[in-house]
Amino acid sequence: MRCLPVFVILLLLIASAPSVDARPKTKDDVPLASFHGNAERTLLNILRDGDNCCIDKQGCCPWG
């Protein structure tokens, strides 16, 4: 029963500790939000272009 307060205090200290990256950042590192934004923009461009080309020509879309 005496260990419970010590355990709770340790959990609080661990949760409030600042996070540290395991490896240093390089110039090639891209934030994940930027990656998701680029992927979404690319997908929207493919879908937008696909709407125009698939009306007249069969097989011109990226997905067949």
Curated annotation (Swiss-Prot):
One CC-aspect GO term: extracellular region
Residues the record lists as Tryptophan amide modifications: 63
UniProt GO MF annotations: toxin activity
Repressor found in the keyword field: no
Propeptide positions: 23-48
This protein's name: Conotoxin VnMRCL-04
Tissue specificity annotation: Expressed by the venom duct.
Signal peptide: 1-22
Localization of this protein: Secreted
Pfam families in the cross-refs: Chi-conotoxin (PF16981)
Keywords tagged on the record: Amidation, Disulfide bond, Neurotoxin, Secreted, Signal, Toxin
Modification note: Contains 2 disulfide bonds that can be either 'C1-C3, C2-C4' or 'C1-C4, C2-C3', since these disulfide connectivities have been observed for conotoxins with cysteine framework V (for examples, see AC P0DQQ7 and AC P81755).
Superkingdom of the source species: Eukaryota
Domain comment quoted from the record: The cysteine framework is V (CC-CC).
Family (UniProt): Belongs to the conotoxin T superfamily.
